[in-house]
Amino acid sequence: KSTMWFKRLFGAEISAQTVSNIVKELDHQVQHYHRRWLGDDYRFLYLDGLWITVTRPVKVKKVLLVALGVKQDGSKELLSFQLADSESESWWWGFISDLKQRGLAGEKLEALVSDGASGLVKAHRALYPRVSHQPCTFHKANDISAHLANKRHRHRIIADALYVFEATTATQVRKRLRLFCGKWWSKEPKAVRNFVRGFEHCLTYLEYPDPIRTMLKTNNPVERYLQELRRRIIPMRSFNNPKSAERIIYGLIAYVINQPQDVPNYEFTQLA
């Protein structure tokens, strides 16, 4: 079974003994990864979650909490991950607290980017109270879907909402917001009301020039990793247990980071 999942994940066949050796090395690497000192040289912090299935002792859904940091020099690093029961405030509190205990005090941290989930936002405000929050504008626009009276409006109204955030100044954004409200209020008042609620909190990205502005306004930097993890996890359907899940996820992260892209690795080359 181990050789089968390795082939599914990485597209290569290896012996059972090699898999056993890799598993032992991964256990060591996972421990080191979760205990390593992070330091406090991060300018931006991205937080997100990915839901997966664990089958033992019973079949349950777990969420993989992930943190990506952007340093002062612009380099990116996957800081941590954790399997959690939910995205509640208490789980996010524990996850972020661990980052702080390992050196990420937040003295240089300017903004935290997330999908705007209430539990995460509450934990962020408590643990990094002086750090600005930038809700992902893509999630903000797509949240409209849940409040539509007519689902046939979905693509057009979301496109219009995303267009609002393409403006490069606060004045332009607010002008586009007024036009958006004028166009859609009579057709979709509930959706418009939801979009306007908390809108001003979504404009932190406008305080920065490009390309930082583009990078900050969505969760894309960390979503790229989650999409690749999701693509490789799907063939497995589920994990046998939390320890197996953590080991495999770490191995996948190591593999993904070592693929050609614009994100430097931590020290995953030790797995080679």
Regions from the PLM with identified roles:
Residues 110-118, 123-160:
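Conserved beta-strand -> loop -> alpha-helix junction used to position metal-binding or nucleic-acid-contacting
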Residues 3, 20-23, 158, 226, ...:
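Hydrophobic face of alpha-helices
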Residues 162-272:
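Acidic/histidine-rich catalytic cores and adjacent linkers
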Residues 5, 9-113, 118, 122, ...:
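RNase H-like nuclease fold core
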Residues 12, 16, 106, 134, ...:
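Alpha-helix N-cap/helix-initiation sites
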Residues 1-6, 176-177:
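Short, charged amphipathic recognition helices of the HTH superfamily
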